[in-house]
C-alpha cells in the first residue's frame, strides 16, 4: 500500500496571476483547437509505429468498451436519456440498441432523479448498470442517489452490500452552452468517500477506464468531455482487445521532462502537451506532462516522483479554483515533496465565475495553451 494514503489536513492557497498573463482569444478551447494536439501526439506516440495500430475517436473507444462489456456480461445494461433509439446525445451508444435490444439499452424519461434511482436500485439488486447523464450538470438532480445511496451502501452494510454502478457522461467545458452546462465536477465527486472517479483524455484512456469502471464492484464516476468525443488518437493493438483495462490510481507520463512537472486531466492534458512543445521550441525547456487519468484514487506517488526530478510543479484543470483538484495536488505536494521545490507550486484553473455565454468572456474563463505556457515561463524565469 502506498505510503501516501494517510489522511492529511488540506491547504488552501490563493493564486494571484500577473497582469501580463491573460488568456488569448485565439486559444479558445474548441474542437478545432484539439486537432493539432492530436497530430502532435501521433508524431511522438510509440503506438503510431507499432503493427496493428488503428485510429479511434474517443467516441468510438467508449462505444467499443460498452459493446464489449454488454457482450461479455449479461448483468450489464445501459440506461439514460436518448441512449437507445437516438444512439445517444453524442452518439456514444450508436448501434447498441440494435445489437443488444431494448432490455439492455433503455431510453428513460427526462428525470435524472428517477432513472439514477432505478439504476442504483438495480445495482443493489445485483445488476451492473451504466447510467448515462446527458451532461454531469444534470446529475445534480440525482446527487442524493449518487452520494447517499451508491457511495455509502457498501460501508454502511459492513461490506455486505456492494453497489456496482457506473455513472458516465460529459463533464466540464463545452463551448457556447453557458453557466449551467459547463461546470467541472471532478472535485465534487473526488471528495466523496466510497466513489471512484476517473477522467479520460485519449481513446485508450476512455476505453480502458470505462471497462475498468463497469467491472469494478464500487460505484465509479467517469467524467468525459464533450469536445473530446470527436478527437482521434492512435489505439495500440493491445488496447483494441476486449480484455484491455486500465488500473485506477495510476497516472501516465505523456511527455517526459526534467525542468517542470505539469499535472493535468481530461482535455487539459492536450493543452498542456501543446504548451510543453512551445516551451521547448522557444526556451529549450523540457516539461514533463502527467495525465492523471484517475482522480480518486489519485496517483500521488507519480506526482511526487516527478517533482523530485523537476523541482517545479504546475497543476492545470478546468474546474473552479476554490477547493479544486489543483488545490489538492498542491497540498499533497507541499506535504510530501516540499523540500524538493525550487519555486512555489502553481495552479491554473477555470475562472471563479459562472461560465459566461458571451464568447469573448467565455474564452477568458478556462485554461488555454498560451496561459499554461506563460505560467511555466514565469516559474522558470525565462
UniProtKB/Swiss-Prot annotation:
UniProt keyword list: Metal-binding, Mitochondrion, Oxidoreductase, Potassium, Pyruvate, Thiamine pyrophosphate, Transit peptide
Keyword Transcription regulation attributed: no
Cofactor(s) the record lists: thiamine diphosphate
Residue numbers binding K(+): 165, 213-214, 216, 218
Compartment(s) where it occurs, according to its Swiss-Prot or TrEMBL record: Mitochondrion
Residues that hold thiamine diphosphate according to the record: 112
One Pfam family recorded for the sequence: Transket_pyr
Primary subcellular site in the record, as a coarse category: mitochondrion
Transit peptide segment: 1-46
UniProt record, GO biological process: pyruvate decarboxylation to acetyl-CoA
GO terms for cellular component: mitochondrion
Keyword Transit peptide tagged: yes
Superkingdom classification of source: Eukaryota
Protein EC: 1.2.4.1
GO MF terms, alphabetically ordered: metal ion binding; pyruvate dehydrogenase (acetyl-transferring) activity
Reaction catalyzed: N(6)-[(R)-lipoyl]-L-lysyl-[protein] + pyruvate + H(+) = N(6)-[(R)-S(8)-acetyldihydrolipoyl]-L-lysyl-[protein] + CO2
Function: The 10-megadalton pyruvate dehydrogenase complex contains multiple copies of three enzymatic components: pyruvate dehydrogenase (E1), dihydrolipoamide acetyltransferase (E2) and lipoamide dehydrogenase (E3) and catalyzes the overall oxidative decarboxylation of pyruvate to form acetyl-CoA and CO(2). Within the complex, pyruvate and thiamine pyrophosphate (TPP or vitamin B1) are bound by pyruvate dehydrogenase E1 subunits alpha and beta and pyruvate is decarboxylated leading to the 2-carbon hydrohyethyl bound to TPP.
Assembly mode: Eukaryotic pyruvate dehydrogenase (PDH) complexes are organized as a core consisting of the oligomeric dihydrolipoamide acetyl-transferase (E2), around which are arranged multiple copies of pyruvate dehydrogenase (E1), dihydrolipoamide dehydrogenase (E3) and protein X (E3BP) bound by non-covalent bonds. The Chaetomium thermophilum PDH complex contains 60 E2 units, 12 E3BP units, about 20 E1 units, and 12 or more E3 units. The units are organized in 1 E2 60-mer, 4 E3BP trimers, about 20 E1 tetramers, and a maximum of 12 E3 dimers.
Name of protein: Pyruvate dehydrogenase E1 component subunit beta, mitochondrial
Amino acid at each position: 500500500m502506498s505510503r501516501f494514503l494517510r489522511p492529511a489536513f488540506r491547504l488552501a492557497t490563493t493564486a494571484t496571476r500577473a497582469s501580463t498573463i491573460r488568456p488569448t482569444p485565439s486559444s479558445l478551447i474548441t474542437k478545432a483547437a484539439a486537432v493539432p494536439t492530436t497530430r502532435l501526439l501521433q508524431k511522438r506516440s510509440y503506438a503510431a509505429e507499432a503493427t496493428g495500430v488503428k485510429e479511434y475517436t474517443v467516441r468510438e473507444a467508449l462505444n467499443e468498451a460498452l459493446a464489449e462489456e454488454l457482450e461479455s456480461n449479461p448483468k450489464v445494461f445501459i440506461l439514460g436519456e436518448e441512449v437507445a433509439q437516438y444512439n445517444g446525445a453524442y452518439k456514444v451508444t450508436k448501434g447498441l440498441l440494435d445489437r443488444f435490444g431494448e432490455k439492455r439499452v433503455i431510453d428513460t424519461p427526462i428525470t435524472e432523479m428517477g432513472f439514477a434511482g432505478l439504476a442504483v436500485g438495480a445495482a443493489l439488486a445485483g445488476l451492473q448498470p451504466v447510467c448515462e447523464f446527458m451532461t454531469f450538470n444534470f446529475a445534480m438532480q440525482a446527487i442524493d442517489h449518487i452520494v447517499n445511496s451508491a457511495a455509502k451502501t457498501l460501508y454502511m452494510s459492513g461490506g455486505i452490500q456492494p453497489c456496482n454502478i457506473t455513472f458516465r457522461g460529459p463533464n466540464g467545458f463545452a463551448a457556447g452552452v453557458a453557466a449551467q452546462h459547463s461546470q467541472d465536477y471532478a472535485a465534487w465527486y473526488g471528495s466523496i468517500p466510497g466513489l471512484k472517479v476517473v477522467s479520460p483524455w485519449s481513446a485508450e484512456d476512455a476505453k480502458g477506464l470505462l471497462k475498468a469502471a463497469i467491472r469494478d464492484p464500487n460505484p465509479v464516476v467517469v467524467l468525459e468531455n464533450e469536445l473530446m468525443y470527436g478527437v482521434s488518437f492512435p489505439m495500440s493493438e493491445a488496447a483494441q482487445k476486449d480484455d484491455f483495462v486500465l488500473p485506477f490510481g495510476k497516472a501516465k507520463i505523456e511527455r517526459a521532462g526534467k525542468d517542470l512537472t505539469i499535472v493535468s486531466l481530461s482535455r487539459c492534458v492536450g493543452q498542456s502537451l501543446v504548451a510543453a512543445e512551445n516551451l521547448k521550441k522557444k526556451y529549450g525547456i523540457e516539461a514533463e506532462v502527467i495525465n492523471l487519468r484517475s482522480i480518486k484514487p489519485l496517483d500521488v506517488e507519480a506526482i511526487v516522483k516527478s517533482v523530485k526530478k523537476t523541482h517545479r510543479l504546475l497543476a492545470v484543470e478546468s474546474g473552479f479554483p476554490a477547493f479544486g483538484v489543483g488545490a489538492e495536488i498542491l497540498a499533497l505536494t507541499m506535504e510530501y515533496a516540499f523540500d524538493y521545490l525550487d519555486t512555489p507550486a502553481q495552479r491554473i484553473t477555470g475562472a471563479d465565475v459562472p461560465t459566461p455565454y458571451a464568447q469573448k468572456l467565455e474564452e477568458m474563463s478556462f485554461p488555454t495553451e498560451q496561459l499554461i505556457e506563460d505560467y511555466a515561463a514565469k516559474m522558470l524565469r525565462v
